[in-house]
Amino acid sequence: MKRSASDSPLLFDLPLAPDFSQEQQLMKRGLKHIAGIDEAGRGPLAGPVVAAAVVLDQNDLPEGLDDSKRLTAARREALYEIILTKAITVSVASLSARSIDASDIRKAALEAMRRAVIGLTLKPCHALVDGRDVPPGLSCPGSALVKGDQRSVSIAAASIVAKVTRDRMMIRAGAAHPPYGLEIHAGYATQKHRAAIESEGPVPGLHRYTFAPIKGRFDC
């Protein structure tokens, strides 16, 4: 597994908000189009893992971009629409709960990231990836940035797109499976969700059977 050789996990100088400095450093080397990559949905008991890749226009950066976890749902929704309008290209890919169970969540998240880059309408010169790992088989050179969604606006944009996309998917799943309250917690292990799993059982294709407390207790 490739890891960024230059990025340190010990970050004492995180900016108050992500900026374009990481991208500018790469552009000074003649790399024109820089993609930000992030994912949403590593931890839930249900639903897919969703990854997004975003190439922003350096001359028309959306204002207010930040790590999706530091934004309200309403603000994420608003920024999502702005990103889709202003970005040069945006792509989303997801892997299902069954795919996650067939490998593991880390591999599934990295594979979703790889597929998201493939879906871009232009091939980026370089990718900035949130986390510690560059996805295997990435179609362009990449760098892993620990807490990248708080450092790079491109990664922050990808985090917003991935989060909003996944939340919308879980709202639809909630409508199809009312007892679980998926539209409220997006599949995370809330008390209500765990209680529903105990009373109703997990849903094949929706729940992750390799995740506790489901693992080993229910047949898929």
Swiss-Prot record:
Q: What class of enzyme is it?
A: hydrolase
Q: Which cofactor does it need?
A: Mn(2+); Mg(2+)
Q: What catalytic activity does the UniProt entry give for this protein?
A: Endonucleolytic cleavage to 5'-phosphomonoester
Alphabetical GO CC annotations of the entry are:
cytoplasm; ribonuclease H2 complex
Q: Which GO terms describe its biological process?
A: DNA replication, removal of RNA primer; mismatch repair
Q: A GO molecular function for this record?
A: RNA binding
What keywords appear on the UniProt entry? Cytoplasm, Endonuclease, Hydrolase, Manganese, Metal-binding, Nuclease
Q: Where does a divalent metal cation bind?
A: D38, E39, D130
Which domain of life does the protein's organism represent? Bacteria
* Cofactor binding summary note: Manganese or magnesium. Binds 1 divalent metal ion per monomer in the absence of substrate. May bind a second metal ion after substrate binding.
According to its UniProt record, where is this protein mainly located? cytoplasm
Q: What is its EC number?
A: 3.1.26.4
The RNase H type-2 domain covers which part of the protein?
32-220
Q: Where in the cell is it found?
A: Cytoplasm
Question: Which InterPro entries does this chain map to?
Answer: RNase_HII (IPR022898), RNase_HII/HIII (IPR001352), RNase_HII/HIII_dom (IPR024567), RNaseH-like_sf (IPR012337), RNaseH_sf (IPR036397)
- Role, per record: Endonuclease that specifically degrades the RNA of RNA-DNA hybrids.
Q: Which family does it belong to?
A: Belongs to the RNase HII family.
User: What NCBIfam families does the annotation carry?
Assistant: PRK00015.1-3 (NF000595)
Stated name of the protein: Ribonuclease HII
